[in-house]
Amino acid sequence: MAKESSFDIVSKIELPEVTNAINIALKEIQNRYDFKGSKSDIKLEKEELVLISDDEFKLEQVKDVLISKLIKRNVPIKNLNYGKVENAAGNTVRQRATLQQGIDKDNAKKINSIIKDLKLKVKTQVQDDQVRVTGKSRDDLQAVIAAIRSADLPIDVQFINYR
């Protein structure tokens, strides 16, 4: 087996799934008794979620509803970075959550060090917002996948282009 095998480690969020989860969460918020008459809303602005509600307690409830819907749609909630709760217009509070797409340099270094610690015959390359792993043995590549899945990374990762 002279041919090398490879796969890419990426961190992606499917934006259509996020939109679907927001729509389902908004329907639930409109129908829930404890949200009657409140100004609760969820908006998607490019790659940022904006949560708006009357007070911090209701904002946390909106966040819980949204997270439950995101989980049902298989959207990784590890990739949501929440900002501070801030006051908004009309006696409401707002919180922004950025959707992290891609693997940044720090997390790429963590992934690289996890792979190096395995001491397998594989090579890694950081390419923009993904990490490519190549090796001659498919068993080594599967061991790398298992090690990265078991590692406690601050972002959710997917494995694509397994060749």
From Swiss-Prot:
Coiled coil: none annotated. GO terms for cellular component: cytosol. Keywords: Nucleotide-binding. InterPro entries: DUF520, UPF0234-like_C, UPF0234_N, YajQ-like_sf. The keyword Metal-binding does not apply. GO terms for molecular function: nucleotide binding. Pfam families: DUF520 (PF04461). Belongs to the YajQ family. This is Nucleotide-binding protein Bcer98_0876.
